[in-house]
Amino acid sequence: GFDFHFLFTYQKPTYKKYETSVTFSSGYVGKINATGNIVAEIPEVLIELDPSYMITPALKVWTSFRYFSKTYANINQAYYFNGHWETFGGVNWQANKRLSLGCTVVNFLNQTGAKGSIAGAELITKDEAKDIKNQLMTGSYLRPFTVEFTASLKF
């Protein structure tokens, strides 16, 4: 039969009394005052839509759609990522009591972009970020379109 899982999360965790500074050997002083800022890497809205259908008692098809709203990439809120969808889908087949097979398609909508945090951006302020253009940055990215096959054998 048909099954549908839905989850809506609204959250707004903020930093409390988060002030510090660090002086580097070059003399540069990096200051952070993140008090009241939304916690980095946490979306304010998270939505999960997970329909599945058992075609037969041994064959299941499923999809998963997850929405993440705007997410800050550093604690100073100088960088952020726009909201995005992450998608998965697949087929699971219980061939017999010992063997199960599966196929999962990751990112079937072929979404592209970054997520999470940006390496080395912890101390960058909004004012400093305005002057940073055309520079290579590293971080985490959405998983690319991928097809995965699985097999599980139970003894």
Where in this protein do the model-derived segments appear?
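Active-site lining segments that contact anionic ligands and/or coordinate catalytic metals
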Residues: A58-K60, H84-F88, R98-S100, T146
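Extracellular loop and loop/strand-boundary signature of outer-membrane beta-barrel proteins
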Residues: Y28-N37, A73-A78, F88, N134-G139
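Residues that define the transmembrane beta-barrel architecture of outer-membrane proteins
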Residues: E41-I47, G83-T87, R143-V147
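Transmembrane beta-barrel strand/turn architecture of Gram-negative outer membrane proteins
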Residues: L7, F88-N92
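Short acidic, gly/pro-rich beta-turn/loop elements at beta-sheet edges
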Residues: K16-Y18, V61, A73-I75, L99-L101, ...
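C-terminal beta-signal and adjacent terminal beta-strands/loops
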Residues: S69-T71, W93-F155
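Flexible, surface-exposed loop regions and adjacent strand-edge segments
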Residues: T20-V29, S69, A78-G83, S117-D127
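Gram-negative outer-membrane beta-barrel transporters
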Residues: G1-T71
